[in-house]
Amino acid sequence: MKLQLVAVGTKMPDWVQTGFTDYLRRFPKDMPFELLEIPAGKRGKNADIKRILEREGEQMLAAVGKGNRIVTLDIPGTRWETPQLAQQLERWKQDGRDVSLLIGGPEGLAPECKAAAEQSWSLSPLTLPHPLVRVLVAESLYRAWSITTNHPYHRE
């Protein structure tokens, strides 16, 4: 199974790149994790936000591999505690399909992305900066993997 993070935004601060890459390199070869960045639509005073969101959504869905399970990152999604996420990761592995996790831009996810999703995951009831979400998702999935393989990274 391959994990794919599809995120709006291409110009991340160095700390995001450093943090995300640190977890990315830890994933085992049998569970590769990749990042696909979608350029954010140009926002300005007179921008058509609805159209920008629609375009970003189209690009996100086009980046998702055929047959992939789509999981959106969204506040109203399901909140998993770490052991529950580990169980979810095991179910995804048993399913045999690759998993695409979608992170929207400043206005969130396009309705088309939400409609295409099989699951929605909420990291927190707080609104989090999208760059930070990349690092949190990578760390959370790595921690979940460590639980499923009895790796010493996670401690109770």
UniProtKB/Swiss-Prot annotation:
Its EC number is 2.1.1.177. It catalyses: pseudouridine(1915) in 23S rRNA + S-adenosyl-L-methionine = N(3)-methylpseudouridine(1915) in 23S rRNA + S-adenosyl-L-homocysteine + H(+). GO terms for cellular component: cytoplasm. InterPro entries: Alpha/beta_knot_MTases, RlmH-like, tRNA_m1G_MTases_N. It comes from the Bacteria. S-adenosyl-L-methionine binds at L73, G104, L123, S124, P125, L126, T127, L128. It is found in: Cytoplasm. Keywords: Cytoplasm, Methyltransferase, rRNA processing, S-adenosyl-L-methionine, Transferase. GO terms for molecular function: rRNA (pseudouridine-N3-)-methyltransferase activity. Homodimer. Belongs to the RNA methyltransferase RlmH family. NCBIfam families: PRK00103.1-1, PRK00103.1-4, tRNA_RlmH_YbeA. HAMAP family: 23SrRNA_methyltr_H. Specifically methylates the pseudouridine at position 1915 (m3Psi1915) in 23S rRNA. This is Ribosomal RNA large subunit methyltransferase H. It comes from Pectobacterium carotovorum subsp. carotovorum (strain PC1). The gene is rlmH.
